[in-house]
């Protein structure tokens, strides 16, 4: 029986259908202003898209093990596609040169997490220092990698690569986003705190 997956676009669409009305309802319930509502909506859409990109396409029953040829070049299970040595993957890529595909993935990982460095301090005062937002970035990135490994174990095959270098790159992306936040904070409303709607 052939493998089936939940496609990325379908997962994102389903997530948006559930999330957007929920955010709007919560905003109406809390009587927040239009600015905070806009920021919350943007953050919710970003999270749905990010989760969709990180975890889909996802195998759904009935599935089959990946064909052997798809495992070529990787360490065999049960030591799956996991790298716990910092800068190993980055170092190999730099030594042998980045091709277009690798460069696109690298830049994509940075840009994918950059909005997190904007939204966290914008929505929550506790994340408005570089140390705090960096700590959050490390925690979130580690959680993503650990979840990918756990799902691979449950599925019986590694459907995602888990790499400590992804954590490093993601943190760089959040730091970039935080720098952008510091710049745009000069022109945006001072604090999108919850205020009763007028």
Describe the role of every protein-language-model region.
Residues 1-159, 178-198:
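Bulky hydrophobic segments
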